[in-house]
Amino acid sequence: MPYVTPSHPAPPAPPAPAARTGRPRGGGLLLRRLVAVLAAAVTLATGAALVAPATEARAAVPQAAAALERVTSFGANPGALTMYVHRPAALPANAPVVVALHGCTQSAQLYADNSGLNTFADRHGFLVVYAETTTANNANKCFNWFQAGDNRRGQGEAASVRQMVAHATSAYGTDPARAQVTGLSAGGAMTSVLLAAYPEVFAAGAVVAGIPYGCGVDVISAFGCMSPGVDRTPAAWAQAVRDAHPGYAGPWPRVAIWHGDNDPTVVPRNADELRDQWTAVHGLGQTPDRTSTLAPNNTRRSEYVTAGGRTAVEVNRVPGIGHGTPVAPGTGPQQCGATGTQHFIASICSSYWITRFFGLDGTVTEPPTEPPVDPPTEPAACWTASNYEHVRAGRATTTGGYAYAKGSGQNLGLYNTFVTHTLKETPPGHYTIATGSCP
């Protein structure tokens, strides 16, 4: 994703990740040059949009939060992440745990100081785990949400975060049934990854200015996910989640989506696609069952409710803000955060509402026990053809000289008449490379 100077910390689509010891990364000189060109173009195009309004930048900064506690050993850590925790002074036994993921160029401490999560951890008694990536992983300190080596179950950064949750249980006595995850921008996109890859670990998640799971498969496609966004059917998005953990039958995590109406970096269309993805996973329609507005700024909330009466998915559209975490500095019960750092935007305390959605203040009951409802599946159809023919037939798209399967986004290789694949369609409009027998 584009290179961004430290004063502009939030765009989630990074340049090609740096190689890690023992984890070779793909991409040669041509890709690096292409990324450099894209970086320059996008930085020029979005630089002004990444600067918060003057009233936000000049807002007074409260005293910084207490320094986080670094955890030096929590597992094999295949993603080479760093683990920090905020532990309330009186952490109860079997406390919930919330994993928090920062945006590009940010740090765990900066996210803790400005997001307001620690305020509610101290108030309600839950542990916050802050995962932090480094420039050794990614030049812009973005989580690698679009890289197969990091966004799949058991691999890379996703596996490292999973190990952090397990360590929280063994070291701090947290309740493994009450683990949640949230993040901003690239951290929001990685939140989507974790909910899809480890649905049995995370009871709920909150994606702030993020991207649906399965959208980006490489650097180039990641740009398209950010803007203009990718339109897929709810069934296709849901299938991407199910494919992340084949055979898993539920229950599925509850998901809250937060997005600024004026976000120029990760366009608001992504909130719609996230809604489509997770409502379909839960077997729900895309028409809200309840709508409301939240004070103090008339944030528009849409809720999608299970047959048992519980909100499985909610979308919160924040008026008048761009790309960042909504905060509301102050000492009131619904206030939190600071706005002295870019991409923490004065509007509404999203951490207050996210904490409520997670049920950490006692306002949400335990999930119903009815089994999840999956949409009906249709028999798969298969086609064997060249990449050129797949694109002509609408089963694939082409970008930068390569072909990508429509729906799944799988890289089919060079766009020509020589490379041939068998593509399977299930559900309608979602194509994947067929493995094994294909009817």
Give the location of each predicted region.
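Short substrate-entry loop that stabilizes the transition state in hydrolases
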Residues: 91-139, 215
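Tryptophan-rich substrate-binding surfaces of secreted polymer-degrading and adhesive proteins
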Residues: 370-439
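Alpha/beta-hydrolase active-site loop
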Residues: 149-172, 193
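The conserved beta1-alpha1 loop
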Residues: 99-105, 209, 259, 319
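Short beta-strand/loop motif that positions the catalytic acidic residue
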Residues: 257-259, 263
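Primarily recognizes the serine-hydrolase "nucleophile elbow" in alpha/beta-hydrolase
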Residues: 113, 117, 169-171, 176-250
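A domain-start/cap signature at the N-terminus of enzymes
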Residues: 2-8, 20, 29, 33-37, ...
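Cap/lid segment of the alpha/beta-hydrolase catalytic domain
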Residues: 132-156, 218-219
